[in-house]
């Protein structure tokens, strides 16, 4: 993932868009584990609270799910992934 962030858009939204792109392109497939908060924060050089906020929003949108004790994963709901692909296609 890239860590060149625009000052005009909140970082958590930019990180969320990066994760969505990885899902749409297949780098993160349905059911795949999403990197841990600290791991992703370190990789992107951002505050862990920013990544936590990103994950909360992804869960709210139904794109990510938390499995207690094992971490966060891309949803296995094919309908949600298809919806995300359509949404991102219209943005291009």
Regions found by a protein language model. Give the residues of each.
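N-terminal helix-turn-helix
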Residues: 34-65
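Short secondary-structure transition/capping segments
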Residues: 44, 78-79
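Short, Lys/Arg-rich nucleic-acid/phosphate-binding segment
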Residues: 34, 63-74, 78
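Short glycine/serine/threonine-biased micro-segments
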Residues: 24, 29, 60, 67-69
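Extreme N-terminal segment that seeds HTH/winged-HTH DNA-binding domains in transcriptional regulators
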Residues: 1-33, 39, 83-90
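Short, low-complexity, polar/charged sequence segments that are solvent-exposed and flexible
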Residues: 53-56, 85-86, 92
